[in-house]
Amino acid sequence: HAWWVRTQKALPARIPLPETLCFEDICERLRAAAVEDTCRTYTENSFFCRSTYRFDGRFLLVRMENFQKADFDAVKKRVNHAVNREFHLPQRYAAGELAYKMRFYILYTEAANDELMRHISRNAETLLRRAEGVMTFVLCGDSLIVPPLYGDADTAAVRRYAGAIRMMRDLLRHPRAH
């Protein structure tokens, strides 16, 4: 049945949040959980911080009215380049640290279009198996949209996936510091 699982197209899941958050509210909640002096606004519609809440994570929040993958990739590239230059973050980690290293991309939008839903529905299992796992979330209205996990996900990827969803849900539900 492994071929069947790999060929199925899974849909992102919507997790309801207790309230609708604006871009600034999300920035504040990330800032409350951030490592001191790591919060940056590199563009008008992006916010970066590092946090050690549940993961040693890099967070990039991007506001997009109408998702276009090329625009999102350009923002990611520009911000990641600036972050690497400013913070001199290592590209290699000790084996014991890898399970906790993550990059989180959070897209904030008023309405999720088809291109956005296709984008977050691709490759979650592959991105979570990287040394520094990568996960993309979407915040749309009062919902957290999470990518589907299907295919050849190993136990470590499933743990990262479940832990990342719990972490995001907690960060967005509670405005206090973690």
Task: Describe the function of each predicted region.
Residues 25, 74, 115, 160-163, ...:
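Exposed alpha-helical structural elements
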Residues 22, 68-71, 159:
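General structural signal for secondary-structure boundaries
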Residues 66-128, 132-136:
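Catalytic cores of nucleic-acid endonucleases
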Residues 120-178:
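Charged, structured surface patches that assemble and position nucleic-acid processing machinery
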Residues 12, 18, 22, 31, ...:
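Compositionally biased amphipathic helical and low-complexity segments enriched in hydrophobic
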Residues 11, 33-37, 86, 165, ...:
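Short, flexible helical or helix-coil boundary motifs
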Residues 46-65, 102-108, 133-148:
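Ordered hydrophobic segments in well-structured contexts
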Residues 3-64:
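N-terminal, charge-rich interaction modules
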